Amino acid sequence: MTKPVRRAGVIGAGVMGSGIMAHFANAGVDVVMLDIVPPGLSEDEKKNPANRNRFAAGGLKGALKAKPAAFFHKNYARRVTVGNLEDDIDLLKGCDLVIEAIIENFDIKRSLFEKLENTLDEGTIVASNTSGLRIADMLEGRSESFRKNFLVMHFFNPVRYMKLLELVAGEETDPAVMKRMTVFGEDQLGKGIVVGKDTPNFVGNRIGCYSMSLTMNEMLDAGLTPEDVDAITGPPMGHPKSASFRTADMVGLDTFKHVSDNCYEALVDDPERDVFKPPAF
């Protein structure tokens, strides 16, 4: 029997971080959600914890107002403590799991992982919600112990409602860590687990980005509009009503471009590499 996750940390209070936080709380997990101190505060503003915690508190507030609802019940938000990475990082001690959902930037992630390694209890599982950055690149400079307890846990938006959870192990990830997070994902979070390899954009985004990019290219070749495409690629094809372009909007065009660029740069030998070039529009 694997140990359940009772306490977790979430780093990053944006759309994904706040969604992960809310669903952890839905599953009965006590959550610490931290974000950076907002830049540009005056010296007087820096003295007020409410100002310093503004990003994390805003993420919690956004989750409480989210539609569709992120929490099963708003009272579950009582399981969440918010703070910032400068003043409150010690709150992560005692966590079974800490997951980051910050910007997809190697340098920023590496800096965070260094800080976590210097703070967390030995054996704490650390996960990244990256949509496709390579584990080996993110963990440059980290210890053997840290790498052993590290994996990718890639949730999809909106976290409460999307069944898929991708788990990806690094070369040195302990199989017991993968087992524990599989049980956590299936039994506590109610997710369907897909185990991917540490390849560009894993499984879901690799397929989804290819499909979306190919659809956009075909639209341009056929002289269609986004409205035309969505009328075809939604319910008439057995797909959700969000179809193609509404799905792209929901995912975020900036996220879609990041995933496309990552695939294009990494898949140098793929015969269909050019599909991942985002259209000029």
What are the language-model segments listed below?
Residues 1-281:
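N-terminal glycine-rich phosphate-binding loop for ADP-containing cofactors
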